[in-house]
């Protein structure tokens, strides 16, 4: 009824965690895109649905979300298996993990890529936005005006053009 009255809604289904077949049917019925978080991709094996080769058009890809550590922070605390698998899959040694995860998100077939400024800037855990379940000390990170450089603008423009993520 809501969609009939309002049309297609800008809703992203947070389909993280345990998702039943019924939930997936409902998500597809209403054409809500699902979430693909790259930081979740390397904990298992090649069949992990968060790996880019499993992304679908009707999804939104993130290197990490506001509820995750930055990519640099994630790498620092990842298990040895996660680091080894990510290094092999992404073809990196972890040196530029944030830049690699950002580029991987842009390269995904997902309709939408959402990238945090913290990851674009390659910041560590001190720039983490939120830690779910903790009631204080979060949501305080602010983008320093000095971070908005011509170099950053060129990077974002280049990635947008390379991966056809520029506005029509």
Regions inferred by a protein language model and the residue ranges of each:
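Catalytic cores of glycan-processing enzymes that make or break glycosidic bonds
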Residues: 1-168
């Amino acid at each position: 009824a809501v969609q009939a009255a309002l049309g297609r809604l800008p809703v992203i289904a947070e389909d993280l965690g345990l998702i039943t077949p019924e939930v997936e049917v409902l998500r597809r019925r209403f054409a809500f895109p699902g979430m693909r978080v790259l930081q979740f991709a390397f904990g298992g094996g090649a069949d992990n649905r968060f790996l880019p080769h499993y992304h679908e058009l009707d999804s939104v890809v993130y290197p990490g979300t506001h509820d995750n550590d930055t990519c640099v922070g994630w790498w620092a605390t990842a298990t040895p298996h996660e680091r080894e698998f990510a290094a092999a899959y992404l073809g990196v040694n972890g040196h530029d993990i944030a830049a690699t995860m950002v580029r991987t998100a842009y390269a995904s077939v997902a309709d939408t890529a959402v990238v945090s400024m913290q990851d674009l800037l390659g910041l560590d855990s001190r720039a983490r936005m939120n830690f779910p379940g903790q009631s204080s000390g979060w949501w305080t990170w602010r983008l320093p005006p000095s971070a908005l450089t011509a170099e950053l603008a060129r990077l974002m423009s280049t990635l947008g053009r390379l991966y056809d993520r520029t506005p029509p």
